[in-house]
């Protein structure tokens, strides 16, 4: 999904039609853009609900895997190919993509539920709080300085993808895997801020595609949630192993 994220980000940048001049525009958020943001976040909430349904379906029916991931990527590609004015169709495709993404993350969700269900709740709440804080920071900022993070974040994402590719070929240790997780978490937390301000700037330039913008934020949210969940599971597993060792000794 990280690979497709970089593809979708590049697609959006090419289609937006705005350049360096937009970075120097520090206008306050207009009422029209505020209404657009409300629609974006409402759509995001619905997509997250659909993703939760997908995760539940995996826990109940064990449907998540490579097929659902490919289906999710295919759905997102289909979404980009549908004209913007076909809102109902694109909204339905977004929900299908979110559901398939939830099913794809389902194995990790099930692992967390089987180990300790409180970890899942804590990870989701932590992600929601982080998302809310970083989003608010991006919205209330008077200057759009966070847009300048785009090049740095893109470079970081490229490094992350390269590390994952190298690990798939040469293998990796637990230490290198956790480095990828923490590094990826840092990158996608940055994207939460960057994407929010980019959405605002695009809206100021007439891009009111709330479905595409909701998809961008949905991808950020899931990427952060997965990494926080992995970190919490690893820490909980280490503590459990340590307790077992103490009992044996």
From Swiss-Prot:
Keyword Membrane carried by entry: yes
Membrane topology listed for this record: Multi-pass membrane protein
Gene Ontology MF annotations: calcium channel activity
Keywords: Apoptosis, Membrane, Transmembrane, Transmembrane helix
Localization (cell): Membrane
Pfam short name (any one): Bax1-I
Gene Ontology CC terms, in alphabetical order: membrane
Record-annotated membrane-spanning stretches: 39-59, 65-85, 93-113, 119-139, 151-171, 213-233
Expression (tissue specificity): Ubiquitous.
Gene Ontology annotations of biological process type: negative regulation of apoptotic process
Key word Transmembrane present: yes
Family assignment from sequence similarity: Belongs to the BI1 family.
Entry function: Suppressor of apoptosis.
Name by which UniProt lists this protein: Bax inhibitor 1
Species whose genome carries this gene: Oryza sativa subsp. japonica (Rice)
Gene: BI1
């Amino acid at each position: 999904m990280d690979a497709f994220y970089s593809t979708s980000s590049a697609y959006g940048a090419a289609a937006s039609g705005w350049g360096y001049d937009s970075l120097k525009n520090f206008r306050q958020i207009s009422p029209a853009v505020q209404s657009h943001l409300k629609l974006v976040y409402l759509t995001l909430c619905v997509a997250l609900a659909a993703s939760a349904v997908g995760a539940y379906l995996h826990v109940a029916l064990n449907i998540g895997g490579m097929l659902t991931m490919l289906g999710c990527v295919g759905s997102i590609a289909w979404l980009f190919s549908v004209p913007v004015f076909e809102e109902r169709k694109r909204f339905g495709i977004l929900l299908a993509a979110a559901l398939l993404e939830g099913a794809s993350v389902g194995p990790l969700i099930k692992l967390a539920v089987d180990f300790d269900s409180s970890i899942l709740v804590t990870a989701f709440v932590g992600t929601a709080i982080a998302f809310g804080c970083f989003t608010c920071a991006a919205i209330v900022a008077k200057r759009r300085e966070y847009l300048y993070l785009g090049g740095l974040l893109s470079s970081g994402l490229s490094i992350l993808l390269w590390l994952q590719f190298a690990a798939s070929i040469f293998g990796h240790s637990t230490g290198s895997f956790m480095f990828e997780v923490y590094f990826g978490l840092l990158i996608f937390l940055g994207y939460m801020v960057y994407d929010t301000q980019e959405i605002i700037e695009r809206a100021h330039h007439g891009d009111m595609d709330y479905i595409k913008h909701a998809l961008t934020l949905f991808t950020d949210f899931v990427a952060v949630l997965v990494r926080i969940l992995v970190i919490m599971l690893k820490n909980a597993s280490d503590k459990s192993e340590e307790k077992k060792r103490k009992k044996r000794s």
